[in-house]
Amino acid sequence: MPRKTPIERYRNIGISAHIDAGKTTTTERILFYTGVSHKIGEVHDGAATMDWMEQGQERGITITSAATTAFWKGMAGNYPEHRINIIDTPGHVDFTIEVERSMRVLDGACMVYDSVGGVQPQSETVWRQANKYKVPRIAFVNKMDRIGADFFRVQKQIGERLKGVAVPIQIPIGAEDHFQGVVDLVKMKAIVWDDESQGVKFTYEDIPANLVELAHEWREKMVEAAAEASEELLEKYLHDHESLTEDEIKAALRQRTIANEIVPMLCGSAFKNKGVQAMLDAVIDYLPSPVDVPAILGHDFADPEKPAERHPSDDEPFSSLAFKIMTDPFVGQLIFFRVYSGVVESGDTVLNATKDKKERLGRILQMHANERKEIKEVRAGDIAAAVGLKEATTGDTLCDPQKPIILEKMEFPEPVISQAVEPKTKADQEKMGLALNRLAQEDPSFRVQTDEESGQTIISGMGELHLEILVDRMKREFGVEATVGKPQVAYRETVRTTAADVEGKFVKQSGGRGQYGHAVITLEPNPGKGYEFLDEIKGGVIPREFIPAVDKGITETLKSGVLAGYPVVDVKVHLTFGSYHDVDSNENAFRMAGSMAFKEAMRKAKPVLLEPMMAVEVETPEDFMGNVMGDLSSRRGIVQGMEDIAGGGGKLVRAEVPLAEMFGYSTSLRSATQGRATYTMEFKHYAETPANVSEAVINAKVK
């Protein structure tokens, strides 16, 4: 079966934004204009097509990044048909993991900003993730019809807060109630959308007289940005500012966008049906197809040290990455995957290279939000969902068994908050275990474990809302009612000084075969780098085969530190000396010796407790500023800055506060500000806990 759309005409894009910037509405409009959905779903009444989880519809926030396919021939029908795969990403900080995993499989992104709120904390997180995966992006300033809308302020914020070079390719005609359309700076024409047809029809008009000067000023900046794409263009531009053709400008802006040097910027109001169509044109004009981005990297299946790559071509061996797992009430488990190379058909056997397991690919479904179409095959550049894969989890490589490869893995953040959870009835115990495992399989930032001492089931995640929603899903999707304990902070332990030449000796010699292991280590702090083990044994004082056992003994001990039994992080261990016994030495003895040496060394190296620090941003009316600041200080918060919210909307306070002090914050913020302030928080880093707090935590844990 030949390819329907050439791969050059594919665009795999994400639409990401801060909560309430209007991202789901924007996606809805895209589906409407590309002819997929006939009734526009509004988030305002909880009916959006993309928000297909019930909680998302209740809370008005998008929770899972559904993948949807749409086709577009341009606003004026002037392009060959392009295929746009859209991954809708959540904008709430507790779902950062969702954004992260979709960034991994995207080729480009459209960042949606609120014309009034501009660049907000979540926008910064998303921007950092896009930088990490080198995702080219365009910016769409939405809600231009709101009071206080200011396109140029957002342009400035992208530069100041995100260090991005935003190049407007449009400017708005009017704002707030008077927002009518945009000036296209490439064509130097005004675009006015027709309200009757919900914006499907539009006209090109002359630029309004009062905007001519401003349009020329911004066009000049845009053309200059385009000219910097190459020496030839720059020369041509310097010779005559008006000499660059429309095609040259577009090609140059495209080149610089794909190189992550600039961010083309557009505006509109998705809710009022203005601007989204031109944004779709910009997706085609400026964002990359799979062939415009570098080949996907990985390593050889048999040799992890040997790099390997796959190019976006149907002729290369099949390779793909499973980036999301969802449980569907009708077909069971759906594995969303992005195909990087080759072709695969339903019924084919694929290799899960990450787990070294072969599986038969059942049905392949292409998703339109929550509706699905069964398809026979997928090719390089496609995004689809597979049914029938039992073993796959997020981040696994699925590939051709004859030509295996393991693609780069995804990095997932460690959870910062945990809660004990118990089923309300004994009968639910087994069901709860099943439900939690299923949810953990879908969401790698959610962990489930059993506390060895208390026997309780502990769930951990990225924030209170994250765990709340998972407990809620357990009830809805699996019918399990559960009671949850108080949230607990994920403390860590580490050391502040070096402890040199500490020995651990494990000797048992009482009749029969004895045990003998002896290891000498030096332990030092290793800030921000995790655990490292260095083998510095000379002259075979510990035989080669026992060295991994020492490392293993230490790794096992890291799970529970000497202060209060919290996991140990950021330490470096040098194994420097030891001894062995010809008969009595074995792996177990050296494992014990390693463990004993580490515990002893940790006690000597000034162990300290670390706690998660959160970046907190509070938006508050000015009258309550004193209350908010006082409250943050009482929570051991350090205020790092304040600024006015645009449009006279009060103040924005940025602070760093320990997570331990943030429980129940939303309730106390509401009462301190008569419900008029809002806040967001996200994990920033671990920091040393002050002595008095540390003591209280240790005493509480030891009791």
Curated annotation (Swiss-Prot):
- Where is the tr-type G domain positioned along the sequence? 8-291
CDD domains listed in its UniProt record: EF-G, EFG_III, EFG_mtEFG1_IV, EFG_mtEFG_C, EFG_mtEFG_II
The question of whether 4Fe-4S is a record keyword is answered with no
Cross-referenced InterPro entries: EFG_II, EFG_III, EFG_III/V, EFG_IV, EFG_V, EFG_V-like, EFTu-like_2, P-loop_NTPase
Q: Does the keyword Protein biosynthesis apply?
A: yes
What GO biological process terms does the UniProt entry carry, in alphabetical order? Answer: ribosome disassembly
Any single Gene Ontology cellular-component annotation: cytoplasm
Q: Which GO molecular function, any one, fits this protein according to its record? A: translation elongation factor activity
- PROSITE patterns named in the record: G_TR_2 (PS51722)
Q: Where does GTP bind?
A: 17-24, 88-92, 142-145
SMART domains reported in the protein's UniProt record: EFG_C (SM00838), EFG_IV (SM00889)
Which Pfam families does this one have? EFG_C, EFG_III, EFG_IV, GTP_EFTU, GTP_EFTU_D2
Q: Where in the cell is it found?
A: Cytoplasm
Q: Which UniProt keywords apply?
A: Cytoplasm, Elongation factor, GTP-binding, Nucleotide-binding, Protein biosynthesis
Principal location listed in the UniProt entry? cytoplasm
Q: What does this gene product do? A: Catalyzes the GTP-dependent ribosomal translocation step during translation elongation. During this step, the ribosome changes from the pre-translocational (PRE) to the post-translocational (POST) state as the newly formed A-site-bound peptidyl-tRNA and P-site-bound deacylated tRNA move to the P and E sites, respectively. Catalyzes the coordinated movement of the two tRNA molecules, the mRNA and conformational changes in the ribosome.
Q: Which family does it belong to?
A: Belongs to the TRAFAC class translation factor GTPase superfamily. Classic translation factor GTPase family. EF-G/EF-2 subfamily.
Stated name of the protein: Elongation factor G 1
Organism encoding this protein: Burkholderia orbicola (strain AU 1054)
Lineage, top ranks: Bacteria, Pseudomonadati, Pseudomonadota, Betaproteobacteria, Burkholderiales
What is the gene name? fusA1
